[in-house]
């Protein structure tokens, strides 16, 4: 589904918490920080599915989204430090440095 369609569904009362809060993941991938903020304001759980949102944002190098999710309590060490490993594999040094500065372990 497109981001616009998801927002329309949310505005019409669709439950955004279904399917492990999957709606937060695609927006994190596409770095729509304002959309992520909106979804969170509507009750999306950024910690769903073992903090998948912060892992996807890290994998794609979206530092602003990563910082926002961390500010809301995302666990950067979830899934054995997957976020920092994905950021490293994809060459996102700024994300790697940020996550390591917060205690993520790159091994």
Swiss-Prot record:
UniProt keyword terms in alphabetical order: ANK repeat, Repeat
Record flagged with keyword Repeat: yes
Pfam families assigned to the protein according to its UniProt record, in alphabetical order: Ank_2 (PF12796)
SUPFAM superfamilies with a match to the protein in the record: Ankyrin repeat (SSF48403)
Residues spanning the membrane: none
Species the sequence originates in: Acanthamoeba polyphaga mimivirus (APMV)
PANTHER family: ANKYRIN REPEAT PROTEIN, GH09064P
Residue windows of the ANK repeats: 19-48, 49-78, 80-107
Protein name: Putative ankyrin repeat protein L14
